[in-house]
Every structure is written in structure tokens, then in C-alpha cells.
């Protein structure tokens, strides 16, 4: 998560060109911060599933139970190696772009005892990223949201809260084993 920390120092060095130009810069930064966060989440999940038999089995069961009968038959014919590759490929293609998905994934894969995103506003910033990336920050009434340096700083702060919570749990789990 060093990339996100770099945003904080970069923000201190931005020149105030003008509100419109700054808002464009801040939109890019918010999208980047949350995209890095989502990639970090995916990397943690993939690493855990690929290195821990219990996590792989938990995730595989969840995936298998959600499949149609036809897809289950395809999975039943796969070797263990093929299943592992397929599950990891599915994880790489999976989107971690909502707080509920992140919470459920960490419960399934890490046996995280509570909602990893609770006590944070990360969901707000994930939605903000979606609004910026897919709608250019346009609201339903046709106007555009304007973003400020505080929005970027808050996005960084909220991602750091979740990352710290996750890393503390992982560190404690490793030390108790």
C-alpha cells in the first residue's frame, strides 16, 4: 500500500491551478487510490486461496454451490490442478468493487470475525470511484460532482483504515498459529 501513501505526499505538492482543473486531478486521484485498494484486496485473497488448503476449499465450495448443474458437471470432470487454475482465474476476474463483496470474501477466505469494512466509509469511496470512472462524476440531474483535496485525503484515510485492520488481523492470526 506504499502507492497510496505516495498520494498523500503528492497532494501536498499540487499547485492550485483552478477549481475545475483541480477537480479533474482529484477525480483521477480518487479513482487511482480506490483502484489500488481493490487490487490490494484481490492480491490478498488470491494469495491466501493459492497458499492455504482450507481457504481454497472454502472458496471452492462457495463457488461450486453457486454454479448451475451444467457448470457443476464441468467442474466435476476437472483434475485438482485444473480446478485450482480455474478458481484462481475466476478470482482474478472477480471485482472487489463493493464493501459487501470485500467483507464476504474476507470472511470466507480468512475467517475474518467481523465485517472488514465496518467502522469505515470505504463503501462511499468505492461508489465515488464508480461514479467518476463510469459516469464522469455526472449525477442523475445532469450536473457534475466537484471534488476537492479533502476528498482525496479522506479516500486515502479510509483505505488505510481497512488495510490496517486487515493487516493487524493477518499478523495476529500468524502469530497465534
Where are these regions (language model features)?
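Amphipathic, Lys/Arg-enriched alpha-helical patches that create a basic surface
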Residues: 119-131, 145-177
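Short helix/strand-bridging catalytic loops that position acidic/His residues to coordinate divalent metals
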Residues: 17-21, 141-152
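Short, charged/polar, low-complexity loop and linker segments
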Residues: 12-20, 109-113, 139
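Long, hydrophobic, amphipathic alpha-helical segments used as structural scaffolds
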Residues: 40-52, 110, 133-136, 140, ...
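Charged alpha-helical initiation segments
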Residues: 1-31
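Helix-loop junctions and short alpha-helical segments
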Residues: 25, 29-122
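Amphipathic, well-ordered alpha-helical segments in soluble domains
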Residues: 3-10, 32, 40, 128, ...
Amino acid at each position: 500500500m506504499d502507492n497510496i501513501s505516495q498520494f498523500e505526499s503528492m497532494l501536498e505538492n499540487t499547485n492550485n491551478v483552478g477549481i475545475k482543473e483541480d477537480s479533474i486531478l482529484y477525480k483521477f486521484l480518487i479513482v487511482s487510490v480506490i483502484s489500488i485498494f481493490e487490487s490490494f484486496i484481490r492480491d490478498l485473497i488470491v494469495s491466501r486461496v493459492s497458499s492455504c488448503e482450507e481457504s481454497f476449499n472454502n472458496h471452492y465450495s462457495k463457488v461450486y454451490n453457486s454454479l448451475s448443474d451444467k457448470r457443476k458437471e464441468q467442474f466435476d470432470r476437472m483434475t485438482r490442478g485444473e480446478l485450482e487454475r480455474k478458481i484462481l482465474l475466476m478470482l482474478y476476474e472477480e471485482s472487489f468493487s463493493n464493501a459487501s463483496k470485500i467483507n464476504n470474501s474476507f470472511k470466507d477466505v480468512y475467517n475474518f470475525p467481523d465485517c472488514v469494512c465496518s467502522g469505515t466509509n470505504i463503501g462511499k469511496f468505492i461508489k465515488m470511484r464508480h461514479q467518476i470512472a463510469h459516469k464522469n462524476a455526472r449525477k442523475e440531474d445532469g450536473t457534475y460532482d466537484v471534488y476537492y483535496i479533502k476528498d482525496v485525503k479522506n479516500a486515502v484515510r479510509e483505505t488505510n483504515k481497512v488495510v490496517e485492520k486487515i493487516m493487524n488481523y493477518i499478523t495476529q492470526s500468524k502469530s497465534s498459529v
